[in-house]
Amino acid sequence: PGLQVTMVEPKPHYYSCFGANWHFAGIRDLSKTKQTFDALRDKHGVEIVQDRVTGWDAEAGRAELAGGGQLSFDRLVVSPGIEFEWDKVDGMGPGDTDRVPHAWHGGEQYRILRRQLESMEDGGVVVLTAPPNPFRCPPGPYERISLIAHYLKQNKPKSKVLALDAKDGFAKQGLFEQGWRELYGDMIEWVSASDGGRLYEVDPKARTVWTQEGFQKHQADVLNVIPPQRAGRIAQEMGLTDRSGWCPVDQRTFASSQQPNVHVIGDSAIAGAMPKSGHAANNQGKMVAAAIVNQLRGQPVPDAKLVNTCYSLVSPTYGISVAAVYRFDGGKITGVEGSGGLSPSEADEFTRIKEARYARGWYDAITD
């Protein structure tokens, strides 16, 4: 009861990654994905400090704020998120995203991409480049491909979506491709890395990309480049990352392997078999909170089971999902054999409709 919890966050609100793709299909206005931190303060008594942590002394238990203040801590939990590895995108940088949006965080980026889709002539080509693993929200690019295709089918049916991928496979691939065939025919073309999909160079001004080591040119009318990713900048600056660019942790407590009294959760953490998803991060936060409380009380860390659930919309009325249960075993988080699973490939139309409804319900519940 005497525990004081303070959250330092520079923004008064944020736009959730999950649900943002729905904006492209007109399912939900982007404003509905705007979330605040009011419930943490009003329901749970968390002190909210609108500032930015610029660094800390883990041994001394002191964090420095951009506004000049300091905060003392017994435990520091950081969620650095992601940053883009622009040095791996030849020809493009952060200054080009008004013309070639990534639309992978931040509300305005989603609006830019939506406006470009609306302005495109019927018969145009939307090119999306999907990043290499690991990255935030593994099914995200493929839900986006689906919902852009839905918009085009309704409004610009002569158009197509060309997806160029840095990988040879992706999350829920069989279910997505089944939905694409059923709903969109040949409107969507997905090109794997082995077949020449790996991004080589971008010309933002011309909205042109090259693949196959620069030998294959693709001209876009709308170009959406999702860059390679690594742990957020503060994690890089404060030495929380390893050579992979991500943050190694004790996967039982998410305590940093690099510094004492610091825990890392969310997309930036190396979390074993768990994906970089919103549901996973939510579970990690709860588990880490329980672990810290027990440690401060001198009690054993709980033997927690972790869960991930991810819904994706192939159309407003066609939902698919994956679920998994995880445990700590042999020093890392592993999947529990026989748990979870995918939506059945043979599901009928009513089941797909129900899963689309469940997706909306899941979003409303996790953001409540």
Language-model segments: which ranges?
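Hydrophobic/aromatic beta-strand patches that form the interior of the parallel beta-sheet core
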Residues: T6-V8, V49, V77, V127, ...
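FAD-site-proximal beta/loop scaffold in flavoenzymes
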Residues: G93-M120, H218-K286, N294
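Active-site substrate-recognition segment that forms the wall
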Residues: P132-K156, C247, S256-I265, A269-A273, ...
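A Rossmann-like FAD-binding core segment of flavoenzymes
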Residues: K43-G55, E59-E64, L71, H150-G245, ...
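FAD-binding core/adjacent interface of flavoenzyme oxidoreductases
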Residues: E47-E143, L147-Q154, N224
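Beta1-alpha1 glycine-rich phosphate/pyrophosphate-binding loop at the start
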Residues: P1-E47, P132-G174
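C-terminal auxiliary extensions adjacent to catalytic cores
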Residues: S321-D368
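Active-site-proximal substrate-binding core of FAD-dependent oxidoreductases
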Residues: M274, A291-G338
